[in-house]
Swiss-Prot record:
Transmembrane region(s): 17-37, 63-83, 95-115, 182-202, 209-229, 243-263
GO molecular function, one term: phosphatidylglycerol-prolipoprotein diacylglyceryl transferase activity
Protein name: Phosphatidylglycerol--prolipoprotein diacylglyceryl transferase
Binding site for a 1,2-diacyl-sn-glycero-3-phospho-(1'-sn-glycerol): R146
Entry's Gene Ontology cellular component terms: plasma membrane
Function comment: Catalyzes the transfer of the diacylglyceryl group from phosphatidylglycerol to the sulfhydryl group of the N-terminal cysteine of a prolipoprotein, the first step in the formation of mature lipoproteins.
Family: Belongs to the Lgt family.
Enzyme Commission number(s) of this protein: 2.5.1.145
Length: 270
């Protein structure tokens, strides 16, 4: 059994300026996206596109900018609508109180999809081509986010058997019983493992939509599994069929991914 190592959320204090670890994890996520996106330009079909359809570093920068907007706006609206709709309908101005916390991955995903559709239309490119480009670059950002969750001592797991060697006590949870370090589980599954699988899968030229579909199915399945070890939101608890809100939101994600993959496989090879 391990004790959560209290980590000061402020990485560096320079006078009145406080640099938080969580902010640094976001910075790392953006940097990793730029690095991987630049590498992705060498993969087919992007490497062989020419003229107006050619992909450049400027495209990667624009996608990152739009993606950040999609994550912030979609993530916040998703949290308000999926997790506390009644409260935020009664207190609509608090939707803008982002500093109070409350972001949803699934809402952020919808925001990113919307921003990618806009990017594709503005560049006169198939939006699935854009989605396939982005998908393998996302998991490292998710991994960085889970590091931030762990440093902040938030989103801890459910109670575990005291004999579990890596069971961890999170004093901030209000209990001294060991829990699953679910942030670490999600870092490994939704971050590192999903990245390796998607990156290897995307190295070969695929039918349009296949890589994006693999991301939807892969993330949905890994998140669904991780939710069994993660403490549900206190104000929601466990919902019908013994599933958490996160699991219920993963179901349509997995179904959409499977349908997209089946559709993509039926398209002629490029």
């Amino acid at each position: 059994m391990l004790m959560y190592p209290h980590i000061d959320p402020i990485a560096l204090q320079i006078g009145p300026l406080a640099i938080h670890w969580y902010g640094l994890t976001y910075l790392a996520a953006f940097g990793l996206f730029m690095f991987l996106g630049t590498r992705r330009l060498r993969h087919e079909p992007y490497a062989s596109l020419t003229g107006a359809q050619a992909w450049t570093r400027k495209d990667v920068e624009d996608i990152l900018f739009l993606g950040v907007l999609g994550v912030v706006v979609g993530g916040r609206l998703g949290y308000c609508l999926f997790y506390k709709p009644g409260y935020y309908l009664s207190h609509p101005l608090e939707i803008f109180y982002i500093w109070q916390g409350g972001m949803s991955f699934h809402g952020g995903l919808l925001g990113v999809i919307a921003s990618m559709v806009w990017f594709a239309r503005s560049r006169h490119r198939p939006w699935l081509q854009v989605a396939d480009f982005v998908a393998p670059c996302v998991p490292t950002g998710l991994a960085a986010g889970r590091v931030g969750n762990f440093i902040n001592g938030e989103l801890w797991g459910r109670f575990c058997d005291p004999s579990l060697p890596w069971g961890m006590v999170f004093p901030q949870s209000g209990s001294m019983l060991p829990r699953h370090p679910s942030q670490v589980y999600q870092f490994l599954m939704e971050g590192l493992l999903l990245f390796v699988l998607l990156w290897l899968y995307a190295r070969r030229e695929r039918r349009q939509g296949e890589v994006a579909a693999a991301f939807l199915v892969g993330y949905g399945c890994f998140r669904f599994i991780a939710e069994y070890f993660r403490e549900p939101d206190a104000f929601l608890g466990i919902l019908s069929l013994g599933m958490s809100m996160g699991q219920w939101l993963c179901v349509p994600m997995i179904v959409a991914g499977v349908l997209l993959w089946v559709w993509a496989r039926r398209q002629p090879a490029r």
